[in-house]
Amino acid sequence: MKQKRGFGSFLIWLVIVAILFFAYSYRDEFKARDFILTGDLSEIVSSIKLTGRADTILRATHPELQQKDAFNESCHSHSQEVYVLGWYREDQDRLYVYNVNSKDLPGVREVTTAHEMLHAAYHRLYFWEKADLDKELKQVYDQLPQDSELRTSMQSYPAS
């Protein structure tokens, strides 16, 4: 009888672990399932043609296209020297895009949305995947000319 009870406890433990693993593995799908993109944000996301996984990640962050005051409230921790048009808040797993309506900057909302989604995707990587990606990115970055636009703009950001 004792052996049956031990096996039953093990089975219950195994089922609980399986459920937790499933919930963790599909957390983005659960968060994204009921989120509906509306208005301009829907058009922006449609125009950038994300993969299925990228679309799920984006929707899981419940992205918001915000006007100036709301955006500044959501993204209050940026430097005054850097123009911030989007913000992925890792602590909240939320994505915010400043609603730039300027004919002088065509596509800026699309580029910003895709860029911030990449921050969210990076946040979801396992530590060993981040280490590999960081290494690859550093190798490419180190090959850039010293006066490249990317190097110049990266100097505005804090080292991580």
Question: Where are the predicted features?
Answer:
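A generic secondary-structure signal for well-formed alpha-helical elements
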Residues: 122-125, 144
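Surface-exposed, polar/charged faces of alpha-helical domains
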Residues: 127-131
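Generic preference for well-ordered secondary structure
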Residues: 28, 41-42, 101, 106, ...
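Glycine-rich, often proline-containing surface loops adjacent to acidic residues and nearby aromatics
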Residues: 93-96, 118
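N-terminal Lys/Arg-rich, disordered targeting/topogenic segments
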Residues: 1-6
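Active-site recognition of the HExxH zinc-binding catalytic motif
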Residues: 111-123
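Short pre-active-site segment immediately N-terminal to the catalytic Zn-binding motif
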Residues: 96-112
